A protein has these predicted regions:
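Hydrophobic aliphatic residue packing
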Residues: 31, 48-50, 71
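Non-catalytic, surface beta->alpha helical segment in thiol-disulfide oxidoreductase systems
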Residues: 53-75
Length: 75
């Protein structure tokens, strides 16, 4: 399983925490973190994908448990 976490500058620690949570749940998962930077300081993005399917996308972060549950729903 390949998970992409696309995040803006302020969400890096959240993205790293999610990577750890996903690896704890599925040790064989690959998690790619991709920083995204906008043209303004107010740019915010937190997006989670399984392969090419977006399962969460927002200008704010949600908790890891919610994301893990969204992944489980797609499996």
């Amino acid at each position: 399983m390949l998970i992409y976490v696309v995040y803006s500058e302020g969400f890096e620690s959240n993205a790293k925490s999610l990577r750890t949570a996903v690896k704890n749940e599925w040790s064989d998962a690959s998690v790619n973190l991709m920083g995204a930077y906008g043209k303004t300081d107010s740019f915010a993005k937190y997006q989670i994908q399984i392969n090419k399917d977006i399962i969460y996308s927002s200008e704010s972060v949600t908790d890891n448990t919610t994301i893990i549950n969204l992944i489980k729903e797609r499996l």
